Amino acid sequence: MIKTQNLTKTYGKGEGKVTALDGVDITIRDGEMVAIIGKSGSGKSTLLNLLGGLDKATDGKVFYNDKDLSTMNDSKLSEFRLKNIGFVFQFFDLIPELTAEENVMFPAKLAKKKETSEGELYTALDINDRVKHYPAELSGGQQQRAAIARALINDPDVILCDEPTGNLDKRSGAEVMNLLKKLNQEQNKTVIIVTHDSDIASQCSRIIELSDGRLAN
């Protein structure tokens, strides 16, 4: 279970102070598929970054079951992310100098995992014949499937997605959503998706809406 308490993030000081997130309290149960929606600047990506331990809150806490992310130093937080959270971003963020396979295996090497299920991932994500190619040689949909494989290589319980279909055509976007739903339904992965697309949000089991850094619903 993921829980936040009074989660707050501000930038700047004095008259230039901007509140990106303002006292957000949410609970996401294991195995949920949740959409986070809201207008541009509402705090969606800020919330996702805090949930993923990619940024530190100004105030408040993020809990993964009984683990409080705010008590972890940078080293412990990096280790926790590596083992427990997979990230999928809008622009794929594959390393251009590495093949798809090398990109997928990169987190496993960081975690020093000797055994992985990369072969099964390639088959499930239909990229078996593309793993030796570099990102520039892949379509947008293939790059995103490689990014999803990378997110899953350490078998995390939680997958955080920031506009995962935002840079894809309609068909590729639908394929990515079907993959995420399958992971949620068949492997009980907790999937959290930031999106501005109402169709994407409607496919999730629950919607959290933000407005000006606060819960709108």
Predicted segments — roles?
Residues 2-210:
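ABC family nucleotide-binding domain
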